[in-house]
């Protein structure tokens, strides 16, 4: 009889402890994307040509009442009307320590490794007859959960001057 009481006590204590810890917020309820900028980043020179890479920069805020942990962000770039992916970039955005309720992190800068090349000045490349607009889909994923689409935007025909390294919260 003593063993059964002891097991019940351990089970009850474990359940109370687990209930007190609470669960992490999920991507749909917690992640708010703001301060979004799209455009083309300077991709340097390749074979004597200027390169432009479609890019998105953004910040996120935890709008939930509890922390969110382990969130990755993925930007997928496509030429409008083309089902093939032009490029994508995945970053670890929020680590194991989490993002507390009401806090924000970023900016994150994600870019395609493929874009446009030309001999003309970068600003003039937007006027070229072969230039086609690109769209970006931004996704987030928490742990082993499914990807959630956060936004879909047409990349603005503008040059961006933004930091090269994405910010991450460990």
What is each PLM-predicted segment?
Residues 21-25:
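Bacterial signal peptide processing site
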Residues 10-19:
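Bacterial N-terminal signal peptides
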Residues 89-149, 154-161:
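Short, solvent-exposed, Trp/other aromatic-anchored flexible loops in extracytoplasmic proteins
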Residues 1-10:
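Bacterial N-terminal signal peptides that target proteins for export
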Residues 65-85:
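Short acidic, flexible loop segments centered on an aromatic residue
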Residues 28-47:
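Short, compositionally biased P/S/T/A/G/V-rich stretches that sit at domain boundaries
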Residues 60-64:
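Asparagine-centered strand-capping/turn motif at beta-strand->loop junctions
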Residues 49-57:
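Short, solvent-exposed loop/turn segments enriched in Ser/Thr/Gly
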């Amino acid at each position: 009889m003593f063993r059964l009481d002891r097991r019940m006590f351990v089970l009850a204590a474990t359940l109370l402890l687990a209930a007190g810890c609470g669960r992490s917020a999920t991507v749909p309820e917690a992640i708010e994307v703001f301060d979004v900028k799209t455009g083309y980043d300077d991709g340097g020179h390749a074979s004597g040509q200027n390169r432009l890479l479609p890019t998105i920069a953004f910040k996120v805020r935890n709008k939930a009442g509890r922390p969110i942990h382990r969130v990755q962000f993925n930007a997928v770039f496509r030429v409008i009307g083309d089902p093939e992916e032009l490029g994508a970039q995945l970053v670890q955005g929020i680590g194991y320590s989490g993002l507390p309720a009401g806090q924000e992190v970023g900016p994150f800068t994600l870019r395609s490794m493929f874009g446009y090349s030309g001999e003309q000045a970068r600003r003039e490349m937007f006027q070229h007859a072969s230039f086609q607009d690109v769209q970006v889909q931004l996704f987030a994923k928490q742990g082993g959960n499914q990807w959630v689409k956060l936004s879909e935007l047409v990349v603005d025909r503008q040059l961006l001057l933004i930091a090269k390294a994405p910010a991450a919260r460990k």
